[in-house]
Amino acid sequence: MGLTFTKLFSRLFAKKEMRILMVGLDAAGKTTILYKLKLGEIVTTIPTIGFNVETVEYKNISFTVWDVGGQDKIRPLWRHYFQNTQGLIFVVDSNDRERVVEARDELHRMLNEDELRDAVLLVFANKQDLPNAMNAAEITDKLGLHSLRQRHWYIQSTCATSGEGLYEGLDWLSNNIANKA
């Protein structure tokens, strides 16, 4: 009886660990999001050449978040981070109408990779504070998310600088990764 209670207690209260890969085109806001989640503040960023990795603690979950640079020359390196990824965060600059097709192409190219077949997808429609930003429904359409029949996905409107929407996204991610486990 005591052992059963101990097992139940540890299952309920043990810290869960999740490996998250955060990608998107350059200047979408990935690094700003990472450090807003990690430190709760805005940091001055420069274009990421390579990656940043941080552990973000949230609601008894330890997210290891890999923020990988999005410049076109280094996107082929994304695949080196796919292994063991449970959740994929794809960050989109909602204000960048010129490159939303490029973002869609990169997203679908990635989702076709075998190593990511079981990863859940969270799209952060970032920069919602800008006046000409596309809303989540428009980005869903432009990214072709409804065509992802075999993939569990969700889109969350965000503003990295204020933190708006970030934790709602993490809630969805943690619930959906936990449900797959």
From Swiss-Prot:
SUPFAM superfamilies recorded: P-loop containing nucleoside triphosphate hydrolases (SSF52540)
A Pfam family that the UniProt record links to this protein: Arf
Chain residues that bind GTP: 24-31, 67-71, 126-129
Principal subcellular localisation of the protein: Golgi
InterPro entries for this protein: Arf1-5-like, P-loop_NTPase, Small_GTP-bd, Small_GTPase_ARF, Small_GTPase_ARF/SAR
The protein's role, per its UniProt record: GTP-binding protein involved in protein trafficking; may modulate vesicle budding and uncoating within the Golgi apparatus.
Name of the molecule in the record: ADP-ribosylation factor 2
Taxonomic classification: Eukaryota, Viridiplantae, Streptophyta, Embryophyta, Tracheophyta
